[in-house]
Amino acid sequence: MGLVNQQLQHALKEWAIAVDALSTGKTIVLLRKGGIREAGFQVQQPLVWLYPTYEHQKPHLLKPEYASKVTPVKSGWHPQTVIIKSCAEITQVLPVSSKEQIEALQPYHIWHEQMISDRLGWQPQRPLIVLLLRVYRLAIPKTILYDSSYGGCKSWIDLIEPISQDNLNPVISDDEYAIQAQKIAALVSAKFNDK
C-alpha cells in the first residue's frame, strides 16, 4: 500500500455494523446516496478512515446475520469516544439505477433487500452508488474523542487529529480482493448492458 508513516485525517462515516463487516473481510461493498444534507454522493477522498456511526442503525434494515448484532440507540446519541480500527482505499465507484442490478449484488453486501429497494427509490433521479473498498486494519485500533463536528447527516468528516497509517494490514489478500471486485463490477456492467 505504500502508506507507512503517513498521516490521514479524512474519514467516511458509516454504520458501525458495516464498518465491522468491512474490517473483518465479510464484505468489500458500501452502498451510498449521500447524506440528507448532501446534493448526492461524491467520493471526496480515495483513501479514508472508516468512522463508525450508531444513530441510524436499525436491525430490520440488515440481513438477519447482521441484524442481531445491532442495538438501536436514541436519536442524537453518540459515544464519548470512537474507535477507529480501519482505513479504506475506495478502488471503484459504480452507479446503479435498476432493481435488477441491486438484486444481482445481494450476496455481496449486508443490507436487507427492502432497505436497498427503499434507498434506490429515494430521490430516484440519483443512482445508488456502489463503493468497492480495499480495507486495511490498524494493528492497534486508535481511540479518539467524539467532536461535535463529526455529527450530522453527512458522509465525510475530517478528524481533529490525523492518525498515522503506520502498521496497517490488509483485511483480505490482494488476490481475494481482486476476484471479488471483478465479480461485482462484472455484475453491474452486465446489468447495464441489458438495458
Model-assigned labels for residue ranges:
Residues 2-195:
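Structured alpha/beta reader/binder surfaces that contact nucleic acids or chromatin modification marks
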